[in-house]
Structures are given as structure tokens and as C-alpha cells.
Amino acid sequence: MIKKVCHFTTAHPIDDVRIFTKECVSLANNGFDITLIACGDIAFEDIKKRVKRISLNVPIKNRRQRFFKCSKAVYKKALEIDADIYHFHDPELLPIGLRLKRKGKKVIYDSHEDLPRQISYKSWIPVIIRKPVAFISEKVENFYSSRLDAIITVSDHIKLRFDKLHSNVVVCHNYASIKEFPEAPEWRINRDNICYVGGLSKIRGILEILEASKASNVKLEIAGAFNSQEIEERLNQNNIIYHGVVNRDKVKMIFSNCFAGLVTLLPAPNHNNANPNKLFEYMAAGLPVIASDFEGWKKMIEKYNIGLCVDPTNVEEIAKAILFLNHNKELAKQMGENARKAFVNTFNWQIEEKKLIELYKSL
């Protein structure tokens, strides 16, 4: 009997790479009947890559609307689906997950972030209450998640916390897919640009990246959404090529122009043990990386010889790394080849999806 599955989210777009492209499509390709529910500016239903997608017309203008209006709409639609397994992706949906569990459904919580550590540096939460809010959020997350059928998360570090609460915790790392990156673009010795693709925020080190690219006099190709006027103004530097928010094909085109990819997140509780998907996308594209010198990242990057690690707060150090790879293109090419090999052999979604399918078949 084919199991009917409903994925739902309030915080992610309906075409989210992890949720739709990786998890939902992988499940559909393995015989599950998949429906994905999300909120957006327009209502539509379609079937894409064997996944039924339902976008609810619930524009999300602020967090309050997401927490209440969107959550209510998603829950109502999820009940209509009457699935065997429900799989949700946002902590504010934990109470809904437990309600579905009490209706006799199998329920999976997919924790994309280390929530309590993430809250501890959220700029929209006043500093004076961040610690108590983080403490309360951890207690609430623990209470609800421990009562569900399974927990999926993105890193071994987060798994350690959930292992204390639940016997069925699975790590599905957010690695890139070989199907999306079947081969690396041909390396051209005249690649003269570097790139950063992702959210453009201070905590992700974008200001230091902009300064370092200017100091090294190298063109920087950027794609992603910014969250402040200061960052928007800084994108007008002469050496910056800002592409805006782009589709997946454009991302790959940007990669093909560059000799290195930057992922220099600033130190933060939720960054130090993270596995940023852009790091693995650079690897998939055969790009050497310039990355933050966090212990786990440094260990992996040095083991596979796929790039350079820097202090992400030190503009001069980032600039020196950029110049080093720019002046040593053959070495950059070799590091990129090492990165691609590590991706194909170890760090790809096709390996991770096997754990996802095994979990589903066990429920």
C-alpha cells in the first residue's frame, strides 16, 4: 500500500531546495504519494516532479502573521489531505504536529536549525530577554518533539541534543544533489571572479566579504536577498556584480565564472557547528572554498584539501586568501577538483536520501 505523506511549512517557500527539491522529490521517486503545503502571495495547486504542491494565499508580512494566520491555514489544509505521515519544518508548528499525532497520525519534526542557539543572537529579539527566550524555546521544543514519531535534523551536533529526548533521530545533511550538479563546469584558467551566494546579512559576514573583495581588487559576484539599507548601499561598490535573488540555473552560471566561493559566516552559536548548504554547493561545482576557521569546517577542508580557512572577522586575512588563490590558479583548480571528488564520494544528497527513505519505511 502506498503511504500518503504531507509535508507542510510556514517559514519556507514552496520551492525550498531542502524541502521540495531534495526531500519531497526523493520520497516521490521512491513510491510515496507526496503533498507539500506552503504559504505565499498567490494560491495555486500544481504537480511538479511527481509532488502535489499547494500554495495557500496567506501573504506573510510579519512573524505574528506567520505564527498564527499561516499556521492555522496550513493546519486546516493538512487535515483535508488526511495523510498517513505528516512531516513539518518549522518550530512554531510543533503544537500542530502534536495535535496530528493525537489523531493517530505518524508525525516527523524536521529541525533545520539549532533553535535555542539561533535565538540567542536574533537581532529582532531585545538583548536583555534573549537568554530567557532561548531557555523557554528549548523547553517547549523538547516537550513537543519528544512526543512525536521521529526527528530529522541537519547536523550531528544538533542530533546530540535530540538524542537525549528521543530514540528515533536521523541526520539528513543538507548536501547538494548529484542530479542537480551532475558534473562541474569546465575550469577556465581565466576565471577572475569570486562569489558569495546566500542570505546577505551581517551575521553571515557580508560586510567583511565586501571589504575584502574591495581590498583585493577582485570582482565579487553576489546573489541573495539583503536585509538592511546599509548592505544595499554597499552593493554599489565598483567591483561588485549583484545578481539579486536568482534561480538555480543562474546560481550554477555564477559558479562557472568564479575561481573560489566564499562562506565566511561570523562566529555565532548556531554557526560554529553548522553545515551550510552553500559550502557543499561550491564543492559540487568544483570550486575551492574560502571558509570560516570553525573547528569542524577546518578539519574537513584540510582533510580533503579543498580550500582555505580564515578568521571571518579579519578583512585582511580574507583578502589575502582571495589573492592567494587568484595568483595560484593551478592550485585553485586542484582544490576545486578535490572538492568535486569529495562531493561525489561523500558529501551528496543521494547518500543522505537513503536515510530519509529508510526512516519513512520504518514508520
Residue spans for each PLM region:
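N-terminal strand-loop element at the rim of the active site
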Residues: 7-21, 25-66, 76-77, 158-163, ...
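Membrane-proximal helix-turn-helix segments that form the acceptor-binding/catalytic region
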Residues: 25, 72-79, 99-102, 109, ...
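Nucleotide-activated donor-binding/catalytic signature segment of Leloir-type glycosyltransferases, i.e.
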Residues: 221-224, 230-255
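Acidic donor-binding loop of glycosyltransferase active sites
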Residues: 256-272, 287
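Conserved acidic donor-binding segment of nucleotide-sugar-dependent glycosyltransferases
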Residues: 303-304, 308-315, 324-329
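A short, well-ordered alpha-helix in the C-terminal region of glycosyltransferases
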Residues: 317, 324, 331-346, 355-358
